[in-house]
Amino acid sequence: MQRRWKYRWIILATLSVAPYSQADEMKLPDIRTQPTPQAVLDEHLDALNKCDWNRLVAQYPEGAQIHLLNGTIVTGRKAIGELFAGFCKGPKDGGLNGINFKVVQSTLIGGTFATHWVATAPFLAEPYKGSDAYITKDGLMQAMVTTFDGAALKMKK
């Protein structure tokens, strides 16, 4: 139980505090649209799995939002860039670089995907399952709602 709380605080600190100083030094990439909603989702997952910060942030317009657990909402390209900067750190630095998300099932309704995925990584003791809603519009990721909880990841000892 103590180990779970330790990781909860590490992940929360990484996602909410640590990236701010990093993102100040980073130049936001140009916005890059995709031809279809499926291409937006595919680009997001491929960039996420490769921890390609430029490709991740290039998908989000200025007014984009990411809805995290407990009502936390990350709004705007800079804040989203900061979020992904923390996520893309190595595991020893509190990030999750090396995690791989694979789609189990995904349904497109309008421009929104309801996607069930499973995450695996060399540093995880077991696969982690979750679901996200990806809201696409005009070839971009307009918003995302996630069930991802870094504190629920079971890390190898």
Tell me the role of every PLM-derived stretch.
Residues 60-61, 119-121, 148:
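Short beta-strand segments enriched in hydrophobic/aromatic residues
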Residues 8-18:
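Bacterial N-terminal signal peptides
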Residues 21-58, 62, 155:
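Short, low-complexity N-terminal intrinsically disordered segments enriched in polar/charged residues
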Residues 44, 56-57, 64, 76, ...:
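Hydrophobic pocket/interface hotspot
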Residues 127-157:
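Short beta-strand edge/turn micro-motifs at domain boundaries
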Residues 1-9:
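Bacterial N-terminal signal peptides that target proteins for export
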Residues 65-75, 89-94:
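A short gly/proline-enriched turn/hairpin at secondary-structure junctions
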Residues 81-127:
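Surface-exposed, charged secondary-structure patches
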